[in-house]
Each structure stands twice: as C-alpha cells, then as structure tokens.
C-alpha cells in the first residue's frame, strides 16, 4: 500500500516536472539617477540605441537622446511628474513609431500619434518609424506637376509644384497660417492628403484651425497633429517628425500629400531647450550646432519620387516667424537655404490692406516655374516686372508730381494689378478663374474701371462666366493653354461683360 503511494507520488512529481514552464520576462532595466525639466539621466542601460523608446515604471515613456559612456540622457514625453531618483527604466528595443495610412485621415492627434479628438482609438496595423532616411537622388524626379494653392499672388508669381519645399516667412499676425489653410482648402477633389502640424501654438488657435477645416469640408482629407504651447518641449520637438512619417506613407504608396509645419521657429526653440538641458554645447543664439541638421533632415523627406517608385509626392510648406522682419536671423536663413523658395509676408502690406500681404520682390519659387500651367505663364509672364516697375514709380511720385503719359498709364495699370491680386481669406480661386482675371488686368480691360471697383468687377465677372460662358472656364481647365481661338473668345467675353458691368 505504502509502495503504491510512493510510486503515485513520484509519477505525479515527474509529470509536474515535465510540464513545468518557467514564464520569465527578460528585460534590461536601468535606474534614474537624476530627473529635471523633462530629461532623465539613467544609469545601467548599456546596449541602448539612439532614439530608442524607453518605459519608466511610472508608465511614462521617453527616448534615449544622449548616449554617454556610463549613462543615458532620456527625453521624457509629457511632464513625468512621478519620475524621481531610483525609478526603474526598461528597454523596449524598438524605435519611435506612429500610426500611418488612411486610418489617421480626418483625425486630430498628438505628437505620439495618439488621438486627442475624442473620436475613439485609431484602428490600424500600419505603423512607421518617425525617423526615416530621405529618398536619394536616383529615387527622385524633377518637380513638374502644379500644386495649386488657390491664391492668385502665389499661383501666378511664386508657383508651387508637387514635391517642392516652399517656406512661408513673415512676422507674427501677417497671415502665414491663413495662406497655409487656404492651400489645404484648395486641395479638395485633388486627391492630396493634407497634414497640418501645429508646434507650440495656443490650443484655442489650433481648435480654430480645425473648425475652419471642418467648415470647408477639408478635414475629410486632412490630419492635424498638435503639440501645443502647453505640451512639453519633447512633444513639440517630435511633432513634425511624426507628421512627415504619416505624409511619407502616402508618398511611398504612389499618392500625393501636403504637409504644413506651423511653425519651425518654435520647433527650433523646443530643440534648443532640450539640448541645453542635456548639456550639449550651445552655439549661435544659444542653439546647438546641429539645429541646421534637424531641419534639413526633416525637409529633405519632402520629395517627388521617380516613376519606378510610384511617382508619389510629398510637398512641404514650413512656416517661420521673423522678429521685426529680420530674415537674416539664424533660423530663417537656415531654412531659406534648405527650401526651394520662400513666400515673404510683410507687416506694412498687411496693414495697408494688401492681403495676402505677399512681398512680390522678395518672394521666389526656385523650381515651381516648371510646374506652372502654360495658361498661367502666358498671362502672368510680365506681371512680376510690371509690379516692380509700379513700386518704383510709386516711390518716385512721392517726390515728383509731373509724370509723362506712359508713366501715368503704367501707374494706373499697376494700381489695378495690385487690386487684382488681393483676396479674402479662406476663399481660394480655381486656376481657370485666376487666368481670366489676371488676363483682364494685364490686357487693359480694367483700365477704365476705378481702382476701388476692381474687386467688385471680379466678384461679378466669375458668376457671369459661370452662367453664360462656362465653356471658356472648362476649356482653360482642360487645355491648360490659351491658344488663339480661346484668347479671342476670352476677349469677346470680357468686352461683353464690360458693357453690362455698371460700377
């Protein structure tokens, strides 16, 4: 009897030993040595990768930014109020990733790609690293397709092409964000996904932007990433990289995307704050030595891909805020040298009622001309020169009252062209309508219209064309060039409208 029991016991023990599984969770763990201002110094993590995501026992997360001989400098997402000396830190062995694809479209996210719009979780299996290598020379193609903003002054004088980087620069309160929002609204029906990255903006300002996009039906094809002024410097620093990762998904899947960084001045300030806390040596204006590189590696990811890669594109419109119109400061000059041109907005023009307040003389597009449609080129070919001569004459008339007839005529024409380029915010104009009104101004159809009535003339001209001659607009849209027949027809239409137009 006792023999049997012993056998039973030994067989049970053997069975248990055979089926025994040890669930052990292997993790590399370090300890926080010090924590201040959103940066933790961690000891005991030797094999950490640069910008690897680390998890704190408090539930906070961060990335390894400084890899030193015996410690790691970790930038903490959020404010890490519960982190203190001795807190455990665990490696995740993965780099920073954000959700990408169509699942993020129409959503408002934070810098980590987490939804903050109260519309539930993002259901997707597609994630992308926020730090990716920019496409090489052989993977690219010259910019040749237009990306129309719907703003006459931009599409005629500083045209933007798909895959271009065009800087919007100016003092605060000059309408920089409005130009960017107009560009987003104008992409409706163009199969372009738009990403708006707000860096260091007020929450109320971002809420206003989202409301505007919803009002014009633009949120259907847009993503908003918000790292507001109340967020930590780490979140403000990461936001543009999260945004560009989402844009790259569409670029690499043979689609088109537009990304707006609003603004990179605040991004540079956030990076300066992080770098100084990490005790990296400061350089000019106390910015670290690699502040140029953080922007160049971000903006180089905007590209027009070659046909073999699917011919997708990512267009970038970075915004930079200047102080008292000083474009020669450190960050503005850096970004001017990285981008393919700039749109310069001026306070004086803004307050004198010329809106959008684009300084035509200082604004330039280095590659967009190749993307401009032929019809726009035909009507705006001499526009820049005419406006420059008008500004010169205008300055001259302040001292001399007696002008010859030719100069008077030029002055009159210039005044009307300035009026033609004025545009209300959030009212982008299709390219065919832009061609018509610029043609009317350039060919003298507005010479007999008083300067104050030019805007009214335009407001009445478009409905007249849509009602009586929709084929003219349709032909400009499809042909993209003003041939002799179309030009003759356009002249006839404008002459007929002038007879019916009463001031």
UniProtKB/Swiss-Prot annotation:
Membrane protein topology class: Peripheral membrane protein
GO molecular function terms attached to this record: ADP binding; ATP binding; proton-transporting ATP synthase activity, rotational mechanism
GO cellular component: plasma membrane; proton-transporting ATP synthase complex
Compartments where located: Cell inner membrane
Keywords on record: ATP synthesis, ATP-binding, Cell inner membrane, Cell membrane, CF(1), Hydrogen ion transport, Ion transport, Membrane, Nucleotide-binding, Translocase, Transport
Amino-acid positions noted as binding ATP in the UniProt annotation, renumbered to this chain: 170-177
The reaction(s) this protein catalyses: ATP + H2O + 4 H(+)(in) = ADP + phosphate + 5 H(+)(out)
InterPro entries: ATP_synth_asu-like_sf, ATP_synth_asu_C, ATP_synth_asu_C_sf, ATP_synth_F1_a_nt-bd_dom, ATP_synth_F1_asu, ATPase_a/bsu_AS, ATPase_F1/V1/A1_a/bsu_N, ATPase_F1/V1/A1_a/bsu_N_sf
Physiological role: Produces ATP from ADP in the presence of a proton gradient across the membrane. The alpha chain is a regulatory subunit.
Family: Belongs to the ATPase alpha/beta chains family.
Name assigned to this protein: ATP synthase subunit alpha
Classification of source organism: Bacteria, Pseudomonadati, Campylobacterota, Epsilonproteobacteria, Campylobacterales
């Amino acid at each position: 009897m006792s023999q049997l029991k012993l056998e039973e016991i030994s067989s049970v023990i053997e069975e248990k030993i055979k089926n025994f599984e040890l669930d052990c969770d292997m993790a590399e763990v370090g300890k926080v040595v010090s924590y201040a201002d959103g940066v933790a110094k961690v000891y005991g993590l030797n094999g950490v990768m640069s910008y690897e995501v680390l998890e704190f026992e408090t539930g906070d997360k961060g990335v390894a930014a400084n890899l030193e001989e015996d410690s790691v400098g970790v930038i903490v997402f959020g404010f890490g109020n519960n982190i203190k000396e001795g807190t455990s830190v665990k490696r995740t062995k993965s780099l920073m990733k954000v959700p990408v694809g169509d699942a993020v479209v129409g959503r408002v996210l934070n810098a980590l790609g987490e939804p903050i719009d109260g519309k539930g979780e993002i259901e997707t299996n597609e994630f992308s690293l926020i730090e990716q290598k920019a496409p090489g020379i052989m993977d690219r193609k010259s910019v040749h397709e237009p990306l129309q903003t719907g703003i006459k002054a931009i599409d005629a004088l500083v045209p933007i092409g798909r895959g271009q980087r065009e800087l919007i620069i100016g003092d605060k309160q000059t309408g920089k964000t409005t130009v960017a929002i107009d560009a987003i609204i104008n992409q409706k029906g163009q199969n372009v996904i738009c990403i708006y990255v707000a860096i260091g903006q007020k929450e109320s300002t971002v809420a206003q932007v989202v409301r505007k996009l919803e009002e014009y039906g633009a949120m259907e094809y847009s993503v908003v990433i918000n790292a507001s002024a109340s967020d930590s410097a780490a979140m403000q620093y990461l936001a543009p990289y999260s945004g560009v990762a989402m844009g790259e998904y569409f670029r690499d899947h043979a689609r088109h995307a537009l990304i707006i960084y609003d603004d990179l001045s605040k991004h540079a300030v956030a990076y300066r704050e992080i770098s100084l806390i990490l005790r990296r040596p400061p350089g000019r204006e106390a910015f670290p030595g690699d502040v140029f590189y953080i922007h160049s590696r971000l903006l180089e990811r905007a590209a027009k891909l070659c046909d073999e890669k699917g011919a997708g594109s990512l267009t970038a419109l970075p915004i930079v805020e200047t102080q008292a119109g000083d474009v020669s400061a450190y960050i503005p000059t850096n970004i001017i040298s990285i981008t393919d041109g700039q749109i310069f907005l001026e306070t004086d023009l803004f307050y004198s009622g010329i809106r959008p307040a684009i300084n035509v003389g200082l604004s330039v597009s280095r590659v967009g001309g190749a993307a401009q449609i032929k019809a726009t080129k035909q009507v705006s070919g001499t526009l820049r020169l005419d406006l420059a001569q008008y500004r010169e004459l205008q300055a001259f008339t302040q001292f001399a009252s007696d002008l010859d007839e030719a100069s008077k005529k030029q002055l009159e024409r210039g005044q009307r062209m300035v009026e033609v380029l004025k545009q209300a915010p959030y009212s982008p104009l299709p390219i065919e309508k832009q061609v018509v009104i610029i043609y009317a101004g350039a060919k003298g159809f507005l010479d007999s219209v008083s300067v104050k009535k030019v805007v009214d003339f335009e407001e009445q001209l478009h409905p007249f064309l849509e009602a009586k001659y929709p084929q003219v607009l349709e032909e400009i849209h499809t042909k993209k060039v003003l041939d002799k027949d179309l030009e003759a027809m356009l002249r006839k239409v404008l002459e007929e409208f002038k007879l019916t137009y009463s001031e």
